[in-house]
Amino acid sequence: MSQIHTLTMPKWGLSMTEGRVDAWLKQEGDEINKGDEVLDVETDKISSSVEAPFSGVLRRQVAKPDETLPVGALLAVVVEGEAEESEIDAVVQRFQAEFVAEGGADQAQGPAPQKAEVGGRLLRWFELGGEGGTPLVLVHGFGGDLNNWLFNHPALAAERRVIALDLPGHGESAKALQRGDLDELSETVLALLDHLDIAKAHLAGHSMGGAVSLNVAGLAPQRVASLSLIASAGLGEAINGQYLQGFVAAANRNALKPQMVQLFADPALVTRQMLEDMLKFKRLEGVDEALRQLALAIADGDRQRHDLRSVLGQHPALVVWGGKDAIIPASHARKGPEAEVLVLPEAGHMVQMEAAEQVNQQMLAFLRKH
């Protein structure tokens, strides 16, 4: 029995409304497996590959290179089994007619981020998913925000409630820090759990967010069900201190770009808009001081200040790293006590973005067990 699938323009992040087709990676007639990269798409924020959520044969490339299409628009038709061209024509025609009829300003916008006073400061967070299972909290890294999880959040929320937050000093949360240390950030995560009436949660942290997650588990072990640590700080001594210093000091695009490209194995992922957005953030009142405080709290030159490996043995843990990480070496993945470890050789420090499908599948499997 044949099945005709439609591949559509994904929505990456809260603000994405459209994407431009950059290049097709698979051609008509090619066999596609679930998780394969089918085409490259560029948005005003980032460039990435669209992965197939199903298997089959790519029968029709509907979108053309350089074509800009709204979120949800038809990109391609993939067929499992056999299908006549007339059947594919009918699917395309029906999709296009219904998509035009349902689009426009009246279309539902979906969930939006929330803001509230939490632990004495304004905090922004974004929730997806239902009430089934223990909730998961996503904690971003130094200089990031909740959008660092834009390729992961929807997939992870298919099986549980998932909350991504902006840490103090970041995103749209309050910028002023008091002590500017790991405990202050960790206390904010615990305050958010209290605010949301979550007694116990899985924590997933990237980079500095991994150290925050480990520290939360050390401060309040009864509140943490498991740890998913993505290119995490706190698992070894070495760190690229020049990156931290360069990122903090960068005041224009030319100074910022050499720092940002170190985050990715593929420097082409650093778009002009990504740089502009980061510069806008860095120019907000209070951001410079917050980043300087946190950089000092994280590292002394090329040496991390916090060794949190002892916490690993107290909770189920998944450790994920990109083999081409230029910020924190992937060798740290195997330095801690017993934990599940996944090293993706072709990814960099932003491994959860560069290898989203592999990271998502590993995390989903890990979370189901715990």
Curated annotation (Swiss-Prot):
Pathway(s) of this molecule: Ketone degradation; acetoin degradation
Cofactor(s) the protein requires to work: (R)-lipoate
Chain positions with N6-lipoyllysine modification: K45
One GO biological process term: acetoin catabolic process
UniProt-recorded Gene Ontology molecular function terms: dihydrolipoyllysine-residue acetyltransferase activity
Binding note for cofactor: Binds 1 lipoyl cofactor covalently.
Top-level taxon of the source organism: Bacteria
Lipoyl-binding domain location: 4-79
SUPFAM superfamilies: alpha/beta-Hydrolases, Single hybrid motif
Keyword Transferase: yes
CDD domains for this protein: lipoyl_domain
Ranges where the AB hydrolase-1 domain occurs: 135-355
Keywords: Acetoin catabolism, Acyltransferase, Lipoyl, Transferase
Catalytic activity annotation: N(6)-[(R)-dihydrolipoyl]-L-lysyl-[protein] + acetyl-CoA = N(6)-[(R)-S(8)-acetyldihydrolipoyl]-L-lysyl-[protein] + CoA
Protein EC: 2.3.1.12
Transmembrane intervals: none
InterPro entries per record: 2-oxoA_DH_lipoyl-BS, AB_hydrolase_1, AB_hydrolase_fold, AB_hydrolase_sf, Biotin_lipoyl, Single_hybrid_motif
Any Gene Ontology CC annotation: membrane
Stated name of the protein: Dihydrolipoyllysine-residue acetyltransferase component of acetoin cleaving system
